[in-house]
């Protein structure tokens, strides 16, 4: 009977290990595709701006290239190390943990702040186009970009290297695990309450509030401009109808004009909804958890109130935003032509040369 129990236990354990191995392989494949797509998309953006002068000449593209660099750094300095940890089941890089945490905070914050700067740039370009043309020089753009990167460095490396970010260890095991002279296979990135709230405000909540305000104003301005243009078009059509004495078709022409106006407004709304929707869906769940975890108590058996797996899933959701940004922000007609040339597929993908997409770029 004991032999039977032992055999049954062995079968169950081997089945569990096989299932766990399969999950790790699938996870590794999925994360590899995500990392490679992030690298490819953002490398293409950087290469396009570097190679084609007409893309470099537009100041608004300075912000796009800064965003691409920050997302490229996420794919190089942050994602691969975490992917290896997910597959291996432990942190194999030892003392590199603190530097990696600092890179994670810096690159993710830089990506989000660059998105915020882009929204401000586009609002300024649409709300005051003549003033924008005079004032938005390469120097002003570099100052705005430098501000985003400086804030990202200040909020990451200084607190992490000085250990201001860490939650106080609780219990004997955590105190021992925090000692430098003991090896650890876990990269503990748990934050204290002060740092979790302050960093989340700077890295996400304030930028997302600015983006909501700017894109709402952009939609209102675009809506007014579309309706003004449609009114002028209808007036011109009415004058033409009266001149040609073709009153019978006036209602049909006016109806088609209203439909065209509605279509234009819907197009702008869809573009803005995609921009904000993708960003919020990727990052909001993580930052909600980031602020919750330091305040929630551990369960009676000592486990964290939010499982590490759940937290890791939402961390990857946030990083996935870096793979989507090149599609959203650098997929207008100019960039698509450049991508087609770089990839050598002008003949294979002619749609990339001629197709138009709604874009909020000024130029």
UniProtKB/Swiss-Prot annotation:
Cytoplasmic topological segments: 46-61, 121-139, 220-271, 331-363
A biological-process GO annotation: positive regulation of MAPK cascade
Primary site of residence: membrane
An annotated GO cellular component: ciliary membrane
Topology class, membrane: Multi-pass membrane protein
GO MF annotations, alphabetized: alpha2-adrenergic receptor activity; dopamine neurotransmitter receptor activity, coupled via Gs
Any matching Pfam family: 7tm_1
Protein's job: Dopamine receptor whose activity is mediated by G proteins which activate adenylyl cyclase. Could be involved in growth hormone release.
Record-given protein name: D(1) dopamine receptor
Source species taxonomy: Eukaryota, Metazoa, Chordata, Craniata, Vertebrata
């Amino acid at each position: 009977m004991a032999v039977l129990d032992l055999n049954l236990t062995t079968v169950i354990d081997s089945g569990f290990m096989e299932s766990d191995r399969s999950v790790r392989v699938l996870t590794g494949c999925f994360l590899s595709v995500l990392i490679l797509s992030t690298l490819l998309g953002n490398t293409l953006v950087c290469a396009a701006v570097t190679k084609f002068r007409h893309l470099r000449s537009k100041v608004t593209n300075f912000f796009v290239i800064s965003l691409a660099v920050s997302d490229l750094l996420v794919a190089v300095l942050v994602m691969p190390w975490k992917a290896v940890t997910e597959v291996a089941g432990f942190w194999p890089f030892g003392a590199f943990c603190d530097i990696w945490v600092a890179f994670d905070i810096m690159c993710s914050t830089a990506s989000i702040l660059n998105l915020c700067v882009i929204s401000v740039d586009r609002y300024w370009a649409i709300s005051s186009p003549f003033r924008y043309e005079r004032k938005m020089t390469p120097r002003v753009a570099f100052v705005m970009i430098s501000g985003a990167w400086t804030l990202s460095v200040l909020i990451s490396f200084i607190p992490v290297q000085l250990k201001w970010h860490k939650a106080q260890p609780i219990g004997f095991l955590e105190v021992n695990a925090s000692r430098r002279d003991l090896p650890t296979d876990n990269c503990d990135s748990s934050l204290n309450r002060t740092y979790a709230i302050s960093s989340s405000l700077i890295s996400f909540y304030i930028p997302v509030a600015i983006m909501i305000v700017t894109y709402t104003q952009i939609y209102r301005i675009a809506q007014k401009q579309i309706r003004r243009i449609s009114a002028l078009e209808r007036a011109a059509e009415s004058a033409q109808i009266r001149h040609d004495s073709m009153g019978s078709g006036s209602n049909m022409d006016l109806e088609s004009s209203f439909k065209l106006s509605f279509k234009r407004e819907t197009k702008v709304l869809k573009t803005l909804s995609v921009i904000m929707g993708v960003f919020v869906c990727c990052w909001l769940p993580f930052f909600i958890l980031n602020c919750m975890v330091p305040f929630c108590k551990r369960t009676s058996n000592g486990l964290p109130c939010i499982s590490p797996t759940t937290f890791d899933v939402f961390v990857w959701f946030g990083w996935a935003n870096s793979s989507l940004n090149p599609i959203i922000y650098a997929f207008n007609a100019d960039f698509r032509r450049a991508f087609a040339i770089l990839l050598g597929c002008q003949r294979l993908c002619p749609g990339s040369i001629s197709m138009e997409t709604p874009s909020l770029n000024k130029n």
